[in-house]
């Protein structure tokens, strides 16, 4: 098998290649536009013949997430992918995984809604992803790629963080990033962990190995005092993640008087917006949250101290802007610009919005 390779491919395809290369043990998914290339690519590559990775098309998204729950519970690196309405069907299983502290990777290549909506791109799953879309007090790790390269890179990173903290992780992409083609440097092959390594690294896992003590993985606890302590332990873990795993990127901020906050494909559009605005003498910079949870609230608050205004650009009706406003706590004016229904905003539109709202 080849080591590191440079390819031209879609974001969805890059993610599939990266999954095989980073030692993923199993994929369970169901086709839905605009992420179907993930399962198609995995099926074409036949990793079960090389790395022994399992690839299974489940009968539904509900089945997929419960297969993920079971696979993650054995200490295996397992993943699923879907798009917005499909991920909605997974919310019960994600809540169960969070409650039982089972790691796993969920990929959401967003499309417009609500309901079945459209097959065009959107970023309207932000609340569902960052607030815990199922029942109970929980969070999951959420990474937002803005390039084909990051679609590949975030697979291994998501698995590393998921197992480090025993938490489900999500790559929150969108139809633009999933379908666009770019050069990508695929990572070298990482060997799959042996059962012996899993037993050593994951003492909580239910492996079924001979001579091992039984392990019960569950989110159920009928005694309220014990359940409260379990919840308090989860909150302690979430605080640790907030302290250590915030990721973000800034550009053109040295002399910025205004700042655009955007993630995913909206951040790519914002970069061109900034180029156009600066050509007109408007000093504007970019703040791109890479982790949507944990959210870089302290970093945004610090950046806001020297600003005259913040424009939050999203492909939705206004979701991340709530987190930005909480972060700056009224110290600077925050306004939103977004498009709905699967329409992707143009850079010229963002420049116009920036002028209308602040200048």
Write out the residue ranges for each language-model feature:
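N-terminal glycine-rich anion-binding loops that anchor highly charged ligand groups
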Residues: 7-44
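Thiamine diphosphate
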Residues: 37-131, 141-163
């Amino acid at each position: 098998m080849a080591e590191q390779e440079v390819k031209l491919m879609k974001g969805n395809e890059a993610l599939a290649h990266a999954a095989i290369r980073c030692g993923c043990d199993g994929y369970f998914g169901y086709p839905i536009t605009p992420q179907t290339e993930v399962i198609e690519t995995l099926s074409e590559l036949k990793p079960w013949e090389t790395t022994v990775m399992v690839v299974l098309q489940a009968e539904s998204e509900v089945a997929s997430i419960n297969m993920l729950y079971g696979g993650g519970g054995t200490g295996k690196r397992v993943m699923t992918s879907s798009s917005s309405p499909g991920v909605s069907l997974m919310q019960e299983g994600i809540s169960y995984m969070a409650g039982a502290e089972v790691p796993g990777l969920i990929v959401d290549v967003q499309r417009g809604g609500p309901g079945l909506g459209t097959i065009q791109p959107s970023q309207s799953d932000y609340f569902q992803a960052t607030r815990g879309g199922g029942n109970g007090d929980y969070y999951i790790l959420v990474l937002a790629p803005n390039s084909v390269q990051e679609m590949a890179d975030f697979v291994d990173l998501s698995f590393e963080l998921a197992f480090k903290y025993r938490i489900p992780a999500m790559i929150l992409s969108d139809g633009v990033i999933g379908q666009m083609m770019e050069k990508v440097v695929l990572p070298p092959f990482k060997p799959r962990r042996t059962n012996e390594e899993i037993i050593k690294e994951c003492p909580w896992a239910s492996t079924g190995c001979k001579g091992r003590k039984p392990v019960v993985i569950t989110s159920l606890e009928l005694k309220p005092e014990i359940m409260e302590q379990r919840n308090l332990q989860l909150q302690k873990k979430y605080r640790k993640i907030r302290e250590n795993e915030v990721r973000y990127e800034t550009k053109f901020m040295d002399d910025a008087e205004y700042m655009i906050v955007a993630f995913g494909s909206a951040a790519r559009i914002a970069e061109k917006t900034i180029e156009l605005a600066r050509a007109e003498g408007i000093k504007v910079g970019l703040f791109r949250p890479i982790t949507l949870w944990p959210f870089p609230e302290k970093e945004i608050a610090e950046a806001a101290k020297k600003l005259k205004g913040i424009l939050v650009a999203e492909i939705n009706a206004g979701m991340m802007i709530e987190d930005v406003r909480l972060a700056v706590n009224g110290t600077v004016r925050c306004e939103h610009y977004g498009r709905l229904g699967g329409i992707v905003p143009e850079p010229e539109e963002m420049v116009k919005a920036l002028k209308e709202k602040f200048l």
